[in-house]
């Protein structure tokens, strides 16, 4: 079953909050399989204060974090309807093959696509891509453990 999530549902499902909540909306999620999420990048983001003053660029590590949060939503949404899913933890274990293809700047909308490529027990591996429009901004494989 495909589902979408608004910001209120996302906030119930993720332990993150401002300024570290890096997913604004989920366009489509097949729980436990794949997700397409959005992060609207605005000039008001706190990291733009020092990264960089005259040339604001979203830090790559935060693009990776938005992919990790989207991936977490993919697996915790598998328990949609179970309000306890918000209490479920997913821990970042490793990242492989991280590549940054273009800068992300204020005004961009990141479209994050994450798919489960392997799940065994409580460990899950995701293939993640972040796009600005049709242009690939970043990609990585993320390994996480569900707690």
From Swiss-Prot:
EC number in record: 4.2.1.59
Keywords: Cytoplasm, Lipid A biosynthesis, Lipid biosynthesis, Lipid metabolism, Lyase
Cell location: Cytoplasm
SUPFAM superfamilies (alphabetical): Thioesterase/thiol ester dehydrase-isomerase (SSF54637)
Gene3D superfamilies: Hotdog Thioesterase
Keyword check for Lipid biosynthesis: yes
Swiss-Prot/TrEMBL catalytic activity: a (3R)-hydroxyacyl-[ACP] = a (2E)-enoyl-[ACP] + H2O
Protein name: 3-hydroxyacyl-[acyl-carrier-protein] dehydratase FabZ
């Amino acid at each position: 079953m495909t589902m979408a999530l608004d910001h209120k549902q996302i906030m119930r499902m993720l332990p993150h909050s401002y300024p570290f909540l890096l997913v604004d909306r989920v366009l489509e999620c097949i729980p436990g399989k794949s997700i397409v999420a959005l992060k609207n990048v605005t000039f008001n983001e706190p990291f733009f204060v020092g990264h960089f003053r005259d040339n604001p660029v979203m830090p790559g590590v935060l693009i990776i974090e938005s992919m990790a949060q989207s991936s977490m939503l993919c697996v915790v949404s598998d328990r949609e309807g179970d309000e306890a899913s918000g209490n479920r933890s997913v821990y970042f274990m490793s990242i492989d093959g991280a590549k940054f293809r273009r800068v992300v700047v204020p005004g961009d909308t990141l479209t994050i696509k994450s798919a489960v490529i392997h799940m065994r027990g409580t460990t899950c591996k995701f293939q993640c891509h972040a796009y600005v429009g049709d242009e690939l901004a970043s990609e990585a494989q993320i390994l996480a453990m569900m707690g």
